[in-house]
Amino acid sequence: VRAALLVAAAVLGATGLGLIWAARLAATRFLYVSELGAAGEPTAEVFRWGLVLVAVGALLVALGAAPLRPRLRWLAVVPPAAVLAGSAVAFGIASQVTCTVGCPLPVGPAFTWQDLIHTSCAVFGFAGAAFVMLQVAADRRFRALARFSLLSAIAVAVIAGVGGLLSVFRFGTEVGGVLELVATTIALLWLVGLAAFLAVSAVREGRVGTGMPRIPTQSQPNHAATPARVAATYSE
């Protein structure tokens, strides 16, 4: 069951990423990632479904993943599955409560509750996913997955950080938007990779758990240690 959930999560995550990229490529002008789903945009419906699939995929990973045990205490305070489930819920809300045209920051005269809810959920979901990356990077069992998660976390933190600063200061906004898309892509590829890796691990554990016990072979009489008369009987 766990393996099936994780395989489904990988498929949904990859499909969601594909829909987000399809929306971006179909856009006729430069847009930030969240702007693809803004009310009135022709890409809104495709982007919304893409984000929904990502949210469902993340939730399935949280439900089907084997318990992860980060080595560092501050990373083990909250179970990774719980953090990932929270991120999934946040992305699900952000997919339904989209930002307004232009996706303005929810401050000053441009403030709207819609933008505040969308921005808050998107930031919370992304931050939660980044935290899970660090938790998996400090896991004690899956070393290959830990290295993959560490590299993903560093890449997302650096790229998203630079893109976010450019967005806040309204400087090089086009570059900032591209960096935001790249960071989003890396994060979603990590989610797909996490689901696929844990699915393979679940399948292997299932095979070991259902393995048939080895039947000991029956020992045969040793003629050399048998008395002469018994040995003669066997030889006839």
Describe the role of every protein-language-model region.
Residues 1-32, 36, 40-201:
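Hydrophobic, aromatic-enriched alpha-helical segments typical of multi-pass transmembrane helices
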